[in-house]
């Protein structure tokens, strides 16, 4: 009978000890001491129960039966990154006057992902940001906010809810991460810092071992509807396919249609002023958009694993990619495209990882909504052509160095029909040295 009592006691203590609260350990010691004082257990038996309880709990935690942390903590992931940047911008204006700007910058992003239950997940992120610019999470040292080591701004970067009713269906709503909204092989149309607001439904289905298909469809809020301002929306649909040609060769493609309801909407201060506007345009009044933007955007990416294995070179992957865009709502200066390649390691994770990337991009003035393109490529303007080269090298686990160089020009029209030697092209060169750390 006494052995049965000890066995029951041992099981009870194991359950009590499975949580994270350290107070349970003290409570068990007190209870065992009272049982010894009352003669229910001997001192040796009490010590045996305590030792076996500790060993059993350790074993069950290792097997995953119990967690040393509460469930909500175990289901939550904290992630972030810090980037230090030295940047030089060389500009040549129309009067042949050159200007050099050299600054230091920092970017900090911190995100939290939490699994609410088997179907729901939430994500929240904050980031450095100077003035609410949707295309940048950088802040500059000695910035216009005050300089002299003044405090820098932190803003809500994203906040979304994600629902997965089935393995092939996902619904996302809120201020979302861009990859949840659409797939893009380059930042020709969308700067990767943008976190769109609205809702998206996504489908992803594997058809066979070589083929999977996906589709995203969404409605995005551009300007809120108020009593004084008519709201504007954007809508998109993107069907796509992944196809494994063989073990080392794969293809990904998509055809995106995006409609931006912008005609008559007042441009914000973040507009670069390249799209055709109507009304009074000054340094504080940005006019209204003359057109809607109805974008047809095919995109393709070809990936080759170990492309140079035949000649003894260990290069993890080689990618070729490209995009084309046509604004169907207008008839001139309405196209753009990007072409590029990337080779080296897929990800920068450890010492010795390396990556080289090149992109050529061209955008006509009215080819895309001018609030969207990469903010580093000619300051995010349309009506441009640009070369970009990137070299990255891993210094340690989750630490890397990067060199990113842009050489860009303004263009007269949408096919780059301007002499690059002309000062009217207003060429600029942007050089960025980055130290990247992930945690």
Regions found by a protein language model. Give the residues of each.
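N-terminal secretory signal peptides that target proteins for export/translocation
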Residues: 1-3
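C-terminal functional modules
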Residues: 345-349, 362-439
């Amino acid at each position: 009978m006494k052995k049965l009592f000890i066995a029951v006691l041992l099981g009870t203590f194991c359950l009590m000890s499975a949580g994270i609260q350290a107070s349970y350990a003290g409570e068990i010691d007190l209870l065992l001491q009272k049982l010894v004082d009352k003669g229910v257990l001997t001192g040796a038996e009490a010590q045996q129960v305590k030792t076996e309880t500790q060993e059993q709990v350790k074993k069950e935690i290792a097997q995953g039966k119990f967690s040393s942390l509460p469930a909500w903590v175990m289901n939550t992931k904290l992630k972030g990154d810090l980037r230090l940047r030295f940047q030089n911008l060389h500009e040549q204006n129309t009067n042949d006057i050159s200007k050099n700007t050299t600054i230091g910058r920092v970017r900090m992003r911190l995100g939290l992902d939490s699994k609410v239950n088997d179907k729901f997940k939430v994500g929240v992120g904050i980031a450095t940001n100077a003035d609410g610019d949707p295309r940048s999470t950088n802040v500059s040292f000695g910035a216009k906010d005050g300089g002299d080591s003044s405090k820098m701004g932190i803003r809500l970067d994203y906040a979304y809810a994600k629902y997965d009713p089935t393995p092939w269906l996902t619904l996302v709503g809120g201020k979302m991460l861009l990859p949840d909204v659409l797939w893009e092989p380059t930042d020709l149309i969308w700067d990767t810092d943008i976190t769109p607001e609205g809702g998206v439904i996504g489908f992803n289905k594997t058809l066979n071992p070589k083929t999977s298909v996906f589709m995203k469809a969404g409605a995005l809020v551009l300007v809120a509807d108020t009593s004084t301002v008519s709201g504007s929306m954007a809508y998109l649909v993107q069907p796509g396919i992944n196809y494994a040609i063989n073990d080392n060769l794969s293809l990904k493609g998509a055809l995106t249609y995006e409609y931006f309801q912008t005609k008559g909407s007042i441009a914000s201060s973040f507009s670069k002023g390249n799209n055709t506007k109507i009304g009074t345009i000054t340094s504080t009044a940005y006019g209204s958009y003359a057109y809607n933007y109805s974008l047809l955007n095919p995109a393709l990416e070809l990936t080759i694993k170990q492309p140079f294995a035949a000649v003894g070179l260990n290069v993890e992957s080689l990618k070729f990619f490209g995009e084309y865009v046509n604004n169907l709502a207008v008839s001139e200066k309405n196209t753009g495209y990007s072409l590029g390649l990337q080779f080296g390691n897929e990800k920068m994770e450890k010492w010795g990882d390396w990556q080289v990337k090149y992109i050529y991009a061209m955008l006509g003035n009215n080819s895309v909504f001018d609030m969207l393109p990469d903010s580093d490529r000619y300051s995010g303007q349309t009506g441009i052509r640009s070369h970009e080269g990137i070299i990255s090298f891993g210094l340690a686990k989750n630490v890397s160095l990067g060199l990113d160089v842009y050489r860009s020009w303004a263009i007269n029209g949408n096919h780059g029909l301007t002499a690059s030697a002309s000062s009217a092209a207003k060429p600029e060169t942007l050089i960025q040295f980055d130290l990247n750390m992930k945690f």
